[in-house]
Amino acid sequence: MRRRTFVASGLGLITAAASQGLVWTFKAGAVSAQPADKPIAPPQGKWIRLAALPRAVGELLGVAVNGKLVASQGLLPGFKPAGLVYEYDPAGDAWKEKKPMPHPVHHAAVAGLNSKMYLFGGFDLPPSGPPGWNPVNDAWEYDPAADAWKALTPMPTTRGGAVAAVVGGKLYVIGGAGPVPNAGSPTIRPRQPQQSLGTVEEYDPATNKWRARAAMPTPCNHPGCEAVNGKIYVIGGRLSGAFIIGYPGNTNLVQAYDPGADSWVTKTPMPTARSGLNTATLNGIVYAAGGEMQDQQVLAAYRAFEAYDPVSDTWWQLPSMLLPRHECIMAAIGNRIHVAGGAVQSAIVPLPKGLAFETDAHEAFEVST
């Protein structure tokens, strides 16, 4: 068997790409990409186009609730939160605008539980001074059927760019970003000191109370996150500040949290190191789509579409998305992995009049096996 091994150092960042059909495994600080003797069958499917969003908006995030796709947030020029809420009905392939968020934010963590969408933290505009990202600790419950919002007990920690997942009827908010200690201002701005967080906080909807849990070993923001079989998988993300500009640090780490044991372990890294990606789970398989990267020469969003099997700790590279995008709506409904909206390149720069990098495009990976 021909084996290719990529030795990782430091945090184990792997930037080399593997061709389709290879199985990625992690052993003693090395990642091996190799044809398997008895390969686990990767998911099969195709990309299809579906009804576009009512408008092109970046930084919308979504969850599946009662067979529909519920999306919220959005980010406008000048770091202004859009506060949008949309609902997509796959039966009619149609979007509907819903009641806006009571307190518009962007980069809030979202999760679905018991026919509701929960939203935690995020960033709003600072009350004064130049535009920036002001982290908040808001917690909200949204009922799509009633089109109604309910304020919950705020999170103990103010942060944005975190992720959330559900295990055992409780919600876990993980990671995120905020100012460094003694920064003098809670607001973060590009190229100013800021930090990633490893904070983990558990919310119990039955009691409307929070409690702190074991911190994530490698703090990050803008990762993907899914819960499968009682474990939470935090995938990729940004190791430095919240902004992609001026803060390199995309990772392919996969950090798995067991709420029952309140402990963390590291799993096989994702083939593509990226942040601003989105994730969804279908039939026990985690799908990771898109993301962004930036250096002095490239302002890029990814078309990468990869799948992870937590049982075998195996990654596959699947057919790429039709469009590159990051920070988009993503959720599984039926046999489809929906992705919609987002931005098709990575940038926090003023754009010439008439030029936009957000998209209203909506596509889905239709899983056949």
How would you label these PLM feature ranges?
Residues 2-14, 21-369:
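Kelch-like beta-propeller repeat domains
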